Amino acid sequence: MITTITTTTSWTDVFKTSAGAIYQCDAERCWYVDFAGKVAKFDYRCLLKLRKSVYHIDIEQALLNTTKDPDVEIIFICACDHCYVLSLLQIIALKELLEGTFVMLELNHILHERLCGIAS
């Protein structure tokens, strides 16, 4: 089955690193995470869940672990269709991407508050 996209949606860059990018789509009210070879669509709630699950991974403990366990983590988020199987380096890169994204969102919120406060 071939589907044709009839409407064009514009994605706004929120934050980019060499490992990936996060975009915001106002028309669809969602976020696109371009990371680890795939582009995944998240609503804001699921993006927060992704951030929480990545932040809870103890990278230092995993690096200091001397057992023969594989150095990968499976990140699965309830109520989302996406799953990531990532190495420790990829987890660090995803954490950096998510941290930068939420810093940019907070900065945008602060600027919006200040500019709207000046205008009124």
Q: Which residue ranges define each predicted feature?
A:
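Positively charged, low-complexity terminal tracts
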Residues: 1-120
